[in-house]
């Protein structure tokens, strides 16, 4: 794909985008946009307005060129006067002449409301907030399509990157037996000390004998990763964001997880084709075409998967794949499968291509056929008494006492499990025992 001809400044006008959320993702998008001739970001909405001002300054735009506005009228005037506008309510900038909303707030209800309003005002939506996309992405996509607009995930985050890699493989006629991403966590093994460090969890643990599990050898792959897991039980092997992102991928591609909490093996990059294939061929999956994640197992001197994405494909043309294997592509021990992967995700640094594709080509880089196939639900991990408030917080937007699980999507009803991010800040109206999925009937919900 030659991007410079697709997005040629000599034949296209600049795209004007607004941004909601100025955290790590939003700030990186804002910075990178300054180097893109076809992209301008003259408005940012965030709950903490100083964060947006700081993001503009970090991107090379002085505070003197930024106006914090407290009403729609103030925002319109500041915009007309050539200032970059910062607000704490999306309604204040919804009527500005903008082409695209990049939604990266991570706040599910506010995010959904902003996206819906943007669509009503004629903007395309690049949805970065997976918390929102996993719950109402298909609804927002339909609303956008009805108005001739684009709703899409954004390149730079794993869902869009994996959706793109899957679609690339399908266009080329590859039989994809597995797909997924590396988790939030690297497990870094130091063979000299027999220690495993997980920087993401700020833990280092002794693992005597791990050296014997460094390679599969002639042993079954499932046996080896099972022994690794047993040595690393004090570390978390999956997170709610991992599950949420794969729900988004499932709804865009039709591929489903093999089990509600994934297999999530601790695995080296070159082990992917032995693991993410059917059990009949020595892998983990009950059936082909499944989604999963893995925790990248590596030495300190080896490169990380960096939260990247992968597909595992069938090696139908044995002769060609022997050539490719010799060039270094990871293949399974039985030579039936190969892993193709993209070891990076660059946050907002690469989201600009999704913005330009939506505005200039009406193309959704994250796929145009979103369906409610998979729900991220919440399950109590301990007894939760009536009156418990399901507060959501932290970097990973977790709920204390509740874990995420992936289930086939179901209509919302009194006894149906609710999507995880609809539980946020709700109060239990009855006791919920450990192991139970939390349903609508368990919550004290407002009548509206």
Give the positions of each predicted feature.
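Rossmann-fold NAD(P)-binding glycine/threonine-rich loop
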Residues: 109-121, 129-157, 162, 167-168
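Short, ordered loop/turn segments at secondary-structure junctions
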Residues: 47, 106, 130-133, 156-157, ...
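Short catalytic-loop micro-motif centered on adjacent basic/acidic residues
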Residues: 43, 102-103, 125-128, 151-154
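C-terminal catalytic/substrate-binding lobe primarily of soluble NAD(P)-dependent oxidoreductases
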Residues: 1-7, 203-448
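N-terminal glycine-/serine-/threonine-rich beta1-alpha1-beta2 phosphate-ribose binding loop
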Residues: 1-117
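Short gly/pro/ser/thr-enriched loop/turn and capping motifs at secondary-structure boundaries
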Residues: 50-51, 132-137, 158-162, 183-187, ...
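Rossmann-like NAD(P)H-binding beta-loop-alpha module
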Residues: 144, 148, 152-230
């Amino acid at each position: 794909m030659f991007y410079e001809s697709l997005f040629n400044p000599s034949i296209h006008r600049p795209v004007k985008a607004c941004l909601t959320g100025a955290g790590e993702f939003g700030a990186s998008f804002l910075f990178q946009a300054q180097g893109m001739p076809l992209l301008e970001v003259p408005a940012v909405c965030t709950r903490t307005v100083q964060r947006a001002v700081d993001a503009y300054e970090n991107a090379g735009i002085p505070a003197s060129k930024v106006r914090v506005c407290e009403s729609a009228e103030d925002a319109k005037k500041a915009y007309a006067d050539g200032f970059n506008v910062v607000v704490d309510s999306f309604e204040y900038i919804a009527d500005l002449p903008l082409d695209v909303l990049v939604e990266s707030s991570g706040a599910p209800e506010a995010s959904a409301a902003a996206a819906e309003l943007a669509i009503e005002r004629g903007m395309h939506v690049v949805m970065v907030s997976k918390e929102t996309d996993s719950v109402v992405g298909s609804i927002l996509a339909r609303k956008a399509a009805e108005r001739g607009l684009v709703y899409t995930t954004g390149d730079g985050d794993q869902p869009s990157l994996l959706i793109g890699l899957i679609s690339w493989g399908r266009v080329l006629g590859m039989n994809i037996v597995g797909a997924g991403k590396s988790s939030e966590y690297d497990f870094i093994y130091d063979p000299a000390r027999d220690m495993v460090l997980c920087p993401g969890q700020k833990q280092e643990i002794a693992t005597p004998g791990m050296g014997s599990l460094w390679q599969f050898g002639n042993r079954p792959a499932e046996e080896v990763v099972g022994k690794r897991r047993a040595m690393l039980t004090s570390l978390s092997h999956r997170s709610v964001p991992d599950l949420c992102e794969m729900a988004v991928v499932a709804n865009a591609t039709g591929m489903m997880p093999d089990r509600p909490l994934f297999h999530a093996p601790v695995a080296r990059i070159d082990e992917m084709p032995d693991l993410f294939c059917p059990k009949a061929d020595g892998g983990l999956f009950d059936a082909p075409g499944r989604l999963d994640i893995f925790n990248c197992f590596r030495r300190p001197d080896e490169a990380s998967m960096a939260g990247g994405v992968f597909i595992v494909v069938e090696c139908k043309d044995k002769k060609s794949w022997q050539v490719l294997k010799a060039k270094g592509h990871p293949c399974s021990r039985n030579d039936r499968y190969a892993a193709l992967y993209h070891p990076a995700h660059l946050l907002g640094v690469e989201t600009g291509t999704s913005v330009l594709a939506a505005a200039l080509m009406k193309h959704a880089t994250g796929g145009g056929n979103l369906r409610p196939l998979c729900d991220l639900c919440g399950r109590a991990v301990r007894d939760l008494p009536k009156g418990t408030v399901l507060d959501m917080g932290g970097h990973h937007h977790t709920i204390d006492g509740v874990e995420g699980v992936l289930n086939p999507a179901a209509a919302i009803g009194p006894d149906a499990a609710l999507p995880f991010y609809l539980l946020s800040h709700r109060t239990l109206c009855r006791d919920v025992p450990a192991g139970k999925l939390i349903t609508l009937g368990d919550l004290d919900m407002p009548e509206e």
